[in-house]
A protein has these predicted regions:
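TPR/TPR-like (Sel1-like) alpha-helical repeat modules
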Residues: 143-147, 160, 181-191, 217-234, ...
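Bacterial N-terminal signal peptides
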Residues: 8-17
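Boundary at the C-terminal end of the N-terminal hydrophobic targeting segment
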Residues: 20-24
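Canonical tetratricopeptide repeat
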Residues: 75, 124, 165, 206, ...
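Short coil/linker segments at helix-helix boundaries
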Residues: 35-58, 79-111, 117, 124-155, ...
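TPR alpha-solenoid repeat register
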Residues: 72, 121, 162, 203, ...
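The canonical Cys-X-X-Cys-His
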Residues: 262-272
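Residue-level recognition of tetratricopeptide repeat
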Residues: 69, 118, 159, 197-200, ...
């Protein structure tokens, strides 16, 4: 898979993770707008990419009535990223998509001007910055993005969205920028949340892959066996991993393929 495709699928997963607004005091009108934004987000992640224009338009208008609300700015940033990711996933123009990403980043930055401890804005801004900078081979900027995601987890350690963002962003970064300990912590948290579901099964495989990358083959096998014994759609992939362990190891291409599929389809994040 091309680096640009990996970048866009990773961004898509960030967008498709449902936000947990609000983090600010809301008027009834603002609360209603945020509920509608969340509904648009669920439609978008279900593949209804054509909702993006009205999703963005609603949130561009909303701050006029409540200009100091960080949640609205954060929601607008997510909407811009959704529009960009939707365009690229349906064959749109890269230049138009990048314009949306820039607008999204500006919206997150405005949210952080209003509330410097807004965990979701920090996580998403940091995740996008880390991915883009890694793609552009700018390690210092990527490291700043990683630091923002780490700060977001410190602020909201029990936020599924924040954990998802850091986990999936980190797994998509260049090896020199990855933090295996943080990835393990996030995956373990997410496995507990999703235990017994299809997302949980795929997360177990990803956790096994991380163990394999670190040379902990017995622990990797344990994770694969949990899924391989189940009736889950993920069982076939887990069994293939178990066979691979007896034949020299899991192929890097298979590990990356699953991570890319997670970004494109969000099966780990949302499937049941």
């Amino acid at each position: 898979m091309k680096k640009s495709s990996i970048l866009w699928t990773a961004l898509a997963c960030l967008v498709m993770s449902p936000a947990a607004w609000p983090q600010s005091a809301e008027t009834s009108r603002t609360a209603d707008i945020l509920r509608r934004a969340r509904a648009y987000q669920f439609q978008f992640r279900a593949g209804q990419y054509d909702v993006a224009p009205q999703y963005v338009a609603m949130l561009e208008e909303a701050p006029k009535a409540d200009p100091e609300n960080a949640d609205l700015s954060n929601a607008l940033g997510v909407a811009y990223l959704a529009k960009s990711a939707g365009a690229m996933l349906t064959g749109g123009k890269p230049a138009d998509a990048w314009t949306g990403v820039r607008k999204g980043m500006q919206a997150f930055e405005h949210a952080l001007e209003l509330n410097s401890d807004h965990a979701e804005a920090l996580a998403t801004h940091g995740g996008v910055q880390a991915l883009m900078a890694s793609f552009q081979q700018a390690p210092q900027q990527a490291a700043k993005g990683v630091a923002e995601m780490n700060r977001a987890v410190e602020l909201a350690p029990n936020s599924v969205r924040v954990r998802l963002q850091r986990a999936f962003s980190s797994l998509s970064l260049a090896d020199a920028l990855r933090n295996n300990a943080a990835e393990a912590e996030d995956l373990d948290f997410l496995i507990k949340v999703a235990e017994g579901s299809r997302p949980g099964d795929y997360l177990h495989i990803m956790r096994g892959d991380l163990y394999f990358e670190r040379g902990k083959l017995d622990l990797a096998r344990n994770q694969y066996e949990v899924v391989g014994k189940s009736a889950s759609p993920a069982a076939a992939e887990a069994k293939a991993r178990l066979i691979a362990l007896t034949q020299g190891g899991v192929a890097v291409t298979d590990i990356k393929k699953l991570r890319s599929a997670a970004g494109a389809n969000c099966t780990m994040c949302h499937g049941r």
